Design a protein with these regions (language model features):
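Specific transmembrane alpha-helical segments of multi-pass solute transporters/efflux pumps
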Residues: 15-20, 48-98, 134, 224-234
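Hydrophobic transmembrane alpha-helices of multi-pass small-molecule transport proteins
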Residues: 47, 108, 117-139, 195
Length: 234
């Protein structure tokens, strides 16, 4: 890879790492369902404005529905899972468990898409799992009642990422491809539509929320615009 590619990877890692800190701010204030919905909503708005300025609203070449469906898997479900995990786990745990996404990709590819499980892939997945287990070992202040559901939510999210990689190849790349900005916008619109009923349910039946808090709003805008919208097009 070129030097600029390494720089983009480091920037993306920083953005995704920061997202877990922002979720630790927004989730206690707004709740998991509301935080997940607002994240994808602000991401969709930011991407919509960007593509509108660039004149790229059209040109999906019959793949818009596919990007909507992809958004449920690569954004809607994972973001909901991470917001749920933020109720139970410190940000460092979620960020570390996020590193299991490549391992999930290897497993899902072998089990569901007939991808050859080579020694290199299998060895990498095993080493990755060992590394995550060592780094994310339980601390004395974290009970199993919090640890297990948090880990389960994070692993569900990374499984979605692993699945999304193969579906992107099948639904987008093998059908002629599509610009990253268009895929990102369609995905965030799809995730917004998916999470909207959960948001409505939370507003009507969930715990009361004080929407006048300024810091959570700043965090949710940063989470949606910077960590999500910018992250998906880097």
């Amino acid at each position: 890879m070129r030097v600029i590619d390494y720089g983009r990877l480091l920037l993306l890692a920083a953005l995704w790492g920061a997202s877990f800190l922002f979720m630790r701010i927004t989730t206690p204030a707004f709740g998991a369902l509301n935080s997940a919905f607002l994240r994808v909503l602000f991401a969709a708005i930011a991407l919509g404005l960007l593509l509108g300025v660039q004149g790229k609203w059209s040109g999906y070449q019959g793949k818009f529905t596919s990007t909507l469906q992809l958004g449920v898997i690569n954004s809607g479900l994972p973001f909901l899972m991470y917001c749920l995990a933020a109720q139970w786990l410190p940000a460092g745990y979620s960020a570390t468990l996020n590193a299991t996404a490549p391992m999930m990709g290897v497993l899902i590819g072998a089990l569901c898409f007939a991808e050859p499980l080579t020694l290199r892939k299998g060895g990498g997945a095993i080493l990755g799992a060992i590394g995550v287990a060592v780094i994310a070992r339980p601390t004395s202040g974290l009970s199993a009642a919090l640890l297990l559901p948090g880990i389960g939510a994070c692993l569900t999210a990374t499984a979605c990422y692993g699945l999304a990689g193969f579906l992107t190849r099948r639904w987008i790349q093998q059908r002629g491809g599509l610009e990253a900005e268009r895929v990102a916008l369609g995905s965030q619109v799809g995730a917004t539509l998916f999470l909207f009923p959960f948001f409505l349910w939370s507003c009507w039946h969930g715990p009361a929320v004080d929407w006048r808090q300024s810091l959570p709003w700043i965090a949710i805008v940063m989470l949606g615009v910077v960590c999500t919208a910018a992250g998906y097009i880097i």
